[in-house]
């Protein structure tokens, strides 16, 4: 399983709407997922040379909380704190690799991983009664607000969620990953932590996603400039494994009628082979990859 499909599979097992897309019993799914991908609290990405990453740890925490598995939640949290929470702030290094002298080859964070970790910790305290996790959730949320937001070059009062604390930003041009915008998590964390900027980032993020949908293309990465959207300098400009999460997060945030959900449905057209959906394409509509993996087809069924 690749890094992105691991994320997709985790999310597809974690929401009531997406559980309905599967025939198996959800608790059995969780146990199978845990046995396959979790080792002593480490969520393993087997097809990426066994690395672990902050997104996987965040989703693992969210799954464990959603299924009421306190033991697994504690183990995933403990591993995360010991191995990824190594920065001077409350954010995580995004990647851990086994069998290396330096297990952390890149100390930069990935904001979506921090967002989901904080949200899982918040839910653990608020919804599961594991209240000792609440304080950590609020501290992470405050550092996301402090370090991972930047003004939209077109509207200074519209905060953009950055892909990382050290991500490229300037007054005239800001790099974003639209799939990092998870409105529900941003709003709940902002309200709990007393950080209105996170709530504003959710609101403005939905506006940005609607603007992207109006262009007819939802990219993995895009630059926001004073003149509008532009191809990013560092990344390919395409619909792909990152952007697949946009409709998932909007649906999870009760925004099923959002224009980006409708746009994503048009992107996820049928592939050339039966049962396959398009998961990677260019702005011109050239299909680069299609897949029949359960997570991707579940998203397609969800938004159709």
Segments and roles (model prediction):
Residues 27-111:
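N-terminal carbohydrate-binding/catalytic regions of secreted carbohydrate-active enzymes
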Residues 59, 72, 116, 136, ...:
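Charged catalytic carboxylate motif
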Residues 91-143:
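Substrate-binding cleft of extracellular glycoside hydrolase catalytic domains
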Residues 24, 28, 50-54, 108-112, ...:
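Extended ligand-binding clefts on enzyme/binding-domain cores
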Residues 61-66, 116-126, 184-191, 248-252:
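Short glycine/serine- and small hydrophobic-enriched flexible loop segments
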Residues 5-23:
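N-terminal export signals
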Residues 33, 67, 80-83, 87, ...:
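Alpha-helical solenoid scaffolds that mediate protein-protein interactions
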């Amino acid at each position: 399983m690749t890094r992105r499909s691991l994320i997709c599979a985790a999310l597809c097992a974690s929401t009531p709407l997406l559980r309905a897309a599967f025939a198996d019993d959800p608790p059995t799914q969780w146990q199978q997922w845990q046995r396959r991908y979790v080792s002593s609290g480490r969520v393993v990405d087997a097809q990426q040379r066994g690395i672990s990453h902050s997104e996987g740890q965040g989703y693992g925490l969210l799954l464990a909380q959603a299924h009421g598995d306190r033991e697994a939640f504690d183990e995933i949290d403990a591993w995360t704190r010991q191995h990824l929470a190594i920065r001077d702030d409350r954010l995580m290094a995004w990647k851990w690799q086994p069998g290396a002298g330096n297990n952390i080859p890149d100390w930069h964070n990935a904001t979506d991983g921090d967002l989901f970790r904080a949200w899982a910790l918040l839910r653990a305290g608020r919804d599961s009664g594991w209240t000792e996790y609440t304080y950590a959730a609020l501290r992470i949320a405050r550092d996301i607000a402090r370090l991972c937001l930047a003004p939209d070059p077109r509207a200074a009062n519209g905060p953009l969620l950055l892909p990382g604390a050290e991500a490229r930003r300037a007054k005239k041009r800001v790099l974003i990953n639209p799939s990092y915008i998870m409105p529900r998590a941003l709003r709940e964390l902002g309200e709990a932590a007393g950080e209105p900027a996170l709530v504003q980032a959710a609101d403005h993020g939905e506006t940005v996603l609607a603007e992207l949908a109006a262009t007819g293309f939802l990219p993995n990465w895009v630059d926001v400039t004073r003149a509008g959207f532009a191809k990013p300098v560092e990344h390919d400009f395409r619909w792909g494994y990152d952007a697949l999460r946009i409709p998932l997060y909007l649906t999870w945030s009760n925004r099923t009628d959002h224009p980006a959900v409708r746009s994503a449905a048009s992107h996820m057209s049928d592939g050339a082979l039966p049962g396959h959906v398009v998961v990677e394409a260019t702005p011109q509509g050239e299909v680069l990859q299609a897949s029949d993996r359960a997570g991707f087809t579940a998203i397609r069924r969800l938004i159709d």
